[in-house]
Every structure is written in C-alpha cells, then in structure tokens.
C-alpha cells in the first residue's frame, strides 16, 4: 500500500487557513433559513413597509459575494459577527413594539425622503458619496448614483451594499468586520477619544455623530438590545464595551 506524505509546509498552510477562516463554510452555515426566519420573524408583518423584500436567499447570495463575511476566525468569532451585523441592521430598519428587539427589517426606506440619497436597505445607506463608493465596491459602477432606488428594489443589491459597508474601512474608521473579529487595534487618536474594541465602536462607525459621546440614549440601547438577543440565539458572549456613550465620534478626530 502506498501512502502520500503531507509535508510540514503543507500542514502549516492548512493550519493557517483554518485559523483565518479561509476554509470555513459560508455565512449560510451559521444563518440557516430557519434561524433567519426566527431572528427576523416580524419583517413580513402586514404593518411592515418592507414586507416580502428581505429574503433569506437574497441575504445568502449577497453574503457569498464577500468571502470573509461570517467566515473569519473560530466558530464564536463567526457567530458574533453575524449577531453584530444583524444587531446593527435590525436597529436601522426596526418597526413594531419598542423594547422587544424582534422588529428588525420592517423598513427598507427612510421615512424622511427629502434627499435623493436618503437611507435605504439594511444599513440605511445615505449620502451620494456612499452610494458612489458602494456601487464601485459591489461592481455596479455608477448605477447606484444614477438610480439609488436599486438599493430599495433589488434585495440582493440591498444586502450587498450593507455587507460592503460592513466590510470596508473608510477614512479614519476601521471596518465593522475587523472590529468584531478582533483584528482592529486602536490608534493613539482612538485611545484618546475612548474608542475601544467592542460592539460600541461599531455603532460609532455607523452613526457616531448622532448617537455617541452623549451619554446613555435609546438608539444605542436599541442596537445593544438587538445584538444581545441575537448573541443569545447563537449562544455566544457579547463581549465588553457595548456602548459608545463616552466615545468621541470619528469626525472629531
């Protein structure tokens, strides 16, 4: 009988790939269709303007466009990333009763639509510059600038813009992805601004100018509440530093 011997170098490469999550399955191995329905059960309520828009298949198709999303690190790290992503986006799109943290993904469009580039989709993408960068990032060029409503009418594009934002560092902000998987190291400026690793700095990345460095507030608590619920469903710890109450926002340096 002939045996194939695997070299130490090959074994080292495989071990590295395992640690970095390269060999991990896609996000669908964590977010099954059943779990997706449990997490976002209110989204198809008759009271939700987004009823029927956010589908499991659209989420998985979009997630598969970003190989690192929900696949990096060990099982706990991967699940925490999913919980954090849905925690933040559920707050952005919430409806239903306050305090229950079950009403995520009820809205696809911002209520105030006075600006052409108003908030749309799971991350509530706003501002022309973000539509332009998102379009370039997901490979549709200027399509989102020319037709921003694609983010509210094409569910795969909608999820892709949200995951693009999540995965992408911008200006002096780290990516939400790097923060939640523990690959962000605060700079001296971050430390001076009380921006520390944890879920709270993700809130700062997304909406720090309106929610952070102003003490406890209902918006921050809502984001934390959704995150805690999803961490419980996935049986993972939330980690520390969940709020941004004393963090300066990134625009303040």
From Swiss-Prot:
CDD domains tied to this protein: chitinase_GH19
Biological function: Defense against chitin-containing fungal pathogens.
Disulfide feature: 212-244
Keyword DNA-binding: no
An example Gene Ontology CC term for this record: extracellular region
EC number: 3.2.1.14
Compartments in which it is found: Secreted, Extracellular space
Record-linked InterPro entries: Glyco_hydro_19, Glyco_hydro_19_cat, Lysozyme-like_dom_sf
Biological processes annotated in GO: cell wall macromolecule catabolic process; chitin catabolic process; defense response to fungus; polysaccharide catabolic process
Active site: 92
Protein name: Acidic endochitinase pcht28
Major place of residence: secreted
Keywords annotated in UniProt: Carbohydrate metabolism, Chitin degradation, Disulfide bond, Glycosidase, Hydrolase, Plant defense, Polysaccharide degradation, Secreted, Signal, Stress response
Organism: Solanum chilense (Tomato)
PANTHER family in alphabetical order: ACIDIC 26 KDA ENDOCHITINASE (PTHR22595:SF159), CHITINASE-RELATED (PTHR22595)
Catalytic activity annotation: Random endo-hydrolysis of N-acetyl-beta-D-glucosaminide (1->4)-beta-linkages in chitin and chitodextrins
Signal peptide: 1-24
Any one Gene Ontology molecular-function term assigned to this protein's record: endochitinase activity
């Amino acid at each position: 009988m002939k045996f194939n011997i695997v070299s130490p170098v090959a074994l080292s490469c495989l071990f590295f790939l395992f640690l970095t999550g390269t060999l991990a399955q896609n996000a669908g191995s964590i977010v099954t269709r059943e779990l997706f329905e449990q997490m976002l059960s209110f989204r198809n309520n008759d009271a939700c303007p987004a009823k029927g828009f956010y589908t499991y298949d659209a989420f998985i198709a979009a997630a598969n466009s970003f190989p690192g999303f929900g696949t990096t690190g060990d099982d706990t790290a991967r699940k925490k990333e999913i919980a954090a992503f849905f925690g933040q986006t559920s707050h952005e799109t919430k409806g239903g009763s306050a305090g229950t943290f079950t009403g995520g993904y009820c809205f696809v469009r911002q209520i105030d639509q006075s600006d052409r580039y108003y908030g749309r989709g799971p991350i509530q993408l706003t501002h022309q510059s973000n539509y332009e960068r998102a379009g370039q990032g997901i490979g549709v060029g200027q399509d989102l600038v020319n037709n921003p409503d694609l983010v509210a009418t094409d569910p795969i594009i909608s999820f892709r813009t949200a995951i693009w934002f999540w995965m992408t560092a911008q200006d002096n902000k780290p990516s939400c992805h790097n923060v939640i998987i523990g690959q962000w190291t605060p700079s001296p400026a971050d430390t001076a601004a009380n921006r520390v690793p944890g879920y709270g700095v993700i809130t700062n990345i997304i909406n720090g100018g309106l929610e952070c460095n102003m003490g406890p507030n209902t918006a921050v608590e809502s984001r934390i509440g959704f995150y805690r619920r999803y961490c419980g469903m996935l049986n993972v710890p939330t980690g520390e530093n969940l709020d941004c109450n004393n963090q300066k926002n990134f625009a303040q340096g």
